[in-house]
């Protein structure tokens, strides 16, 4: 009997879970997924935490203690999210040790309201790194223009980074440069960079959502034939750039000093369009040295009926370039698509963060009144 997730791992794709909750940790579900589904990493975001906290009473005791202490909402959010991430880091510590620090990572996002403020992002990254206090933590920083310098400085201070909200190829080039510059600065400061790690989270399904809406408006048969093809092509071309960037003398010098490459991570991998296969953003993005973070529904769908027939990125670069040329030919402005997606991405996380703050504030209020 085939085991698609095991086959995916054997193909060199690291399987991560895009979810975290205290319930998942306390019931042993995360440990089960690590043991039986080959999960070797976890990503989180404000939306995930807001859902977890609003739908469980497992946070009540900590919220009660925080309310008695008079902790403000911002500090309460840090304390609660850091506790879950710390516990998840402990669940995955064995994976981290066994993989030499490549996998076993858990990601915690900085306040997304700081996405355009480099210095405050760096300060928040340092605070979260200290608060969680686990070597297998990733601090998530968005790939905004301000975020790029924060990424460099965070890495330079010896803090591992998950660069999030990457949509476009040119911005991805800048992310790789920010990563390498951070390592170079860390090395120049005398830091050991062998344990310093990073992933670059390239968002996938949202590209199809935005492009397909525009293709529908164009309405021609040529345009409609391109629906559901932009996101995979975009990710494949990103991997092509990754291969080129990490085959340079600049990277060779860093690798000789013990640096690990910044792996591409495919994020936003749940299928939004019901006409597309529910595992398309896994099956079509298989290459060694990549990460695919999936919500549990996608993970279980792939376990049930996913297929691995070999690499699906590198042999299809030419096809990806052709898709981009066809999109341009029918009138899709890809630069505008990417700019729109980045703006929407930051705003969505800001909105989720505000909801998270409101949820925590309400719980603090009720916990405090019952004290």
Curated annotation (Swiss-Prot):
Catalytic residues identified in the record: 140
Main location: cytoplasm
Pathway in which the depicted protein is active: Carbohydrate degradation; pentose phosphate pathway; D-glyceraldehyde 3-phosphate and beta-D-fructose 6-phosphate from D-ribose 5-phosphate and D-xylulose 5-phosphate (non-oxidative stage): step 2/3
Catalytic activity: D-sedoheptulose 7-phosphate + D-glyceraldehyde 3-phosphate = D-erythrose 4-phosphate + beta-D-fructose 6-phosphate
EC number: 2.2.1.2
Molecular-function GO terms, alphabetical: transaldolase activity
Pfam family, one: TAL_FSA
Coiled-coil parts of chain: none
Name the UniProt record assigns to this protein: Transaldolase
């Amino acid at each position: 009997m085939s085991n698609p997730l095991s086959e995916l791992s054997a193909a060199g794709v690291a399987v991560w879970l895009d979810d975290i909750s205290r319930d998942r940790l306390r019931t042993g579900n995360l440990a089960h997924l690590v043991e039986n589904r080959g999960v070797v990493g976890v990503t989180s975001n404000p939306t995930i935490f807001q859902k977890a906290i609003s739908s469980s009473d497992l946070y009540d005791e900590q919220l009660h203690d925080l309310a008695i202490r008079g902790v403000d909402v911002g500090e309460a959010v840090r304390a609660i999210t850091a506790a879950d991430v710390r516990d998840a880091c402990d669940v995955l510590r064995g994976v981290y040790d066994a993989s030499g620090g490549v996998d076993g990572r858990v990601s915690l996002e900085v306040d997304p309201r700081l996405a355009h403020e480099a210095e405050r992002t760096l300060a928040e990254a340092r605070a979260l790194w200290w608060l969680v206090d686990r070597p297998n933590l990733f601090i998530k920083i968005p790939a905004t223009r301000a975020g790029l310098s924060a990424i460099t400085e965070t890495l330079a201070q010896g803090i591992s980074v998950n660069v999030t909200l990457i949509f476009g190829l040119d911005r991805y080039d800048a992310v790789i440069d920010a990563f390498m510059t951070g390592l170079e600065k860390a090395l120049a400061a005398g830091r050991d960079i062998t344990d310093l790690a990073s992933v670059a989270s390239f968002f996938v399904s949202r590209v199809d959502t935005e492009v397909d809406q525009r293709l529908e408006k164009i309405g021609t048969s040529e345009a409609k034939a391109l629906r559901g093809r932009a996101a995979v092509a975009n990710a494949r071309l990103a991997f092509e750039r990754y291969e080129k960037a990490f085959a340079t003398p600049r990277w060779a010098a860093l690798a000789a000093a013990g640096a690990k490459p910044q792996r591409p991570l495919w994020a936003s991998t749940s299928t939004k369009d019901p006409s597309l296969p529910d595992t398309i953003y896994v099956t079509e993005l298989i290459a060694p040295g990549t990460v695919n973070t999936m919500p549990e529904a996608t993970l279980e769908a792939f376990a049930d009926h996913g297929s691995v027939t070999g690499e699906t990125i590198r042999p299809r670069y030419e096809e990806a370039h052709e898709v981009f040329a066809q999109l341009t030919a029918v009138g899709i402005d890809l630069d505008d698509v990417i700019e729109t997606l980045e703006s929407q991405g930051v705003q969505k996380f800001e909105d989720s963060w505000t909801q998270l703050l409101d949820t925590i504030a309400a719980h603090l209020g009720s916990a405090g009144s019952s004290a």
